Every structure is written in structure tokens, then in C-alpha cells.
From Swiss-Prot:
GO molecular function, one term: nickel cation binding
Cytoplasm listed as a keyword: yes
Family, per entry: Belongs to the UreF family.
Keywords: Chaperone, Cytoplasm, Nickel insertion
InterPro entries membership: UreF, UreF_sf
Protein name as annotated: Urease accessory protein UreF
N-terminal signal peptide: none
GO cellular component assignments: cytoplasm
Subcellular compartments: Cytoplasm
Amino acid sequence: MTDQQLLWLLQLSDSNFPSGAFSHSFGFETYMYNEQICDAKTFREALVVYIQTQLTYTDGLACRIAYEQLEANSMEGLQRLNETLFALCLAKETREGTRMIGERLWKLCRDIYGVDELDEIVQTTRSIHPAIVFAAVGRKIGAAKQTTVLTYLFASVQTMVQNAVRGIPLGQTDGQKLLVMAQPYLIHAASIIETLDEEELGAAAVGLEIAQMQHERLPVRLFMS
């Protein structure tokens, strides 16, 4: 990897990158409201489960598949993947939040990195999944597939941790400790993703999906999902 590629990936994975992800907890706020997540320890436990299930088998695997479809120049495969990912989002808030983040990420990356390979999909469906956009950027800048996937995993967890710092709340030092704690799990997840078949896309934690559905009925909310 060149220094320039490294800097591009660091910029893209920065939690301050304005994709809008900071406005979404993707169901974690339901656990916070019910006091199932109330401190660094309980968040750590939930985060590990998230990494080992939904992040690995849905978002992370989707990023790998998207990269491979881009390598094969298969717009049909990307379109099918995009439709499948949104169909897997059972909770309305999560589905809409993912759509908004994906659209914002696509617009930013189109302007910044010149990623125009996804224009046809966006124009046809009016939606694009963030994992697909991330894969497109990784391939555009010449980052290896495995590096792109691992960076996407870290970026996703970094956003969740920063949102937990605000939502629980936690100290900034606790947040950084959680990121260090998560790194071996992310490396392991990336290695698992390399071995998965496309048919395994979509395995998730049922409890988290239910929490995502319940979120829209919370009387007080800090996050949009």
C-alpha cells in the first residue's frame, strides 16, 4: 500500500467523515433506553456480538462481494446485491437510515474520489448501500480487497463507539479503549469474511433486529435509528 492510499483510507474511515452515520445507533439506543447497555462493560459485550454477527455476515461480507463484483465489472451482480441488502433491513428506520448514509457517502465519494461506477444503480434504484460505496472507493484508489474490507469494519465500529460515547455516555478514553479492544475481533472477522459464501449473506443477531424495530417507538430518542 502506498502512502497516498493509506491517507485516503484514513480519511474515509474517520468518524468525522460527514456521511451522517453519527445520527444513527442502529438499534443500540433501544438497549441504552432499557438500561441493558449502561456503561463501557455492557456496551463492550454488545459490540462484540454485533461484530461477530451483523457486521461480519451482512455489512462486511457485502463489502467483499461488492469489491469482487466491481472487479468482474458486473453491474447486474451489484444491483442484485444492493437490492438484497435493503431487503435484509427489516426495521424501517434502519433501512431508511442505511439509504441516507449510502446516498450521502456516494455523493461525497463521487466528488472526492471520482467514484462514478455506481451511478447507474443509484439512478435506477435511488438508493445505494454504504458497504457497496466503500468497496467502490477501495477499488478506485487501488487498495487491496482485504484491506478495504478491514477498513470498512473499523470505520463501522468507530462510528458505533463514538455514538456510544455520546449516548450512554462514556468518556473519550473509554471509547479509545473500546476501539483497541475491538481490533482483534475485527481482524478475525475480516479473515472469516474471506471464507464465506454469498449464500451466507444476511446472518444477524435477532435481538438487535428487534431492538431496531422497537427504536421508532421510544418516547425519547437521541438518534434517528
